[in-house]
């Protein structure tokens, strides 16, 4: 796997500048979260590098690699189906910073909403999500994700 890591913001953002880069990162997250919420395990895992690390407090240890990411999505789907709920993730207050090595460092709030069949939605969790994004073949991929929950802080 070859990962592109330009050193300058101009190389990352292109002629349109940081605003265009920011919009592309928002679009990446919108796509990634919709894959996750629709339980498209393979599609979601493909938005991560092959050797990605995914750390969330609901798991005993970080997930490493795409096969583990696929298994995590399938496990979440079973839990939601058994519980009769649909979960939706909303990403906001996104901060994007560039590293000297061309890696994007992002930090945002992730709100998880749960909706029971036939019931009202409720806010299930408030989290902070911190990622390292790298480019591979012109597309952004998550290399590392750490999620923390406000209720466990």
Predicted stretch roles:
Residues 2-13, 79-153:
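A beta-strand edge to alpha-helix "cap/lid" segment located at domain peripheries
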Residues 41-109:
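A solvent-exposed, acidic/Ser-Thr-rich amphipathic alpha-helical stretch
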Residues 16-17, 29, 54, 81, ...:
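Residue-level detector of alpha-helix boundaries and kinks
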Residues 33-49, 134-138, 143, 148:
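K/E-rich alpha-helical interaction surfaces of small helical-bundle regulatory domains
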Residues 1-38, 42-46:
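Short, low-complexity N-terminal intrinsically disordered segments enriched in polar/charged residues
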Residues 16, 20, 61-64, 121:
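A structural signal for alpha-helical segments
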Residues 23-27, 67, 124:
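A generic "alpha-helical surface" signal
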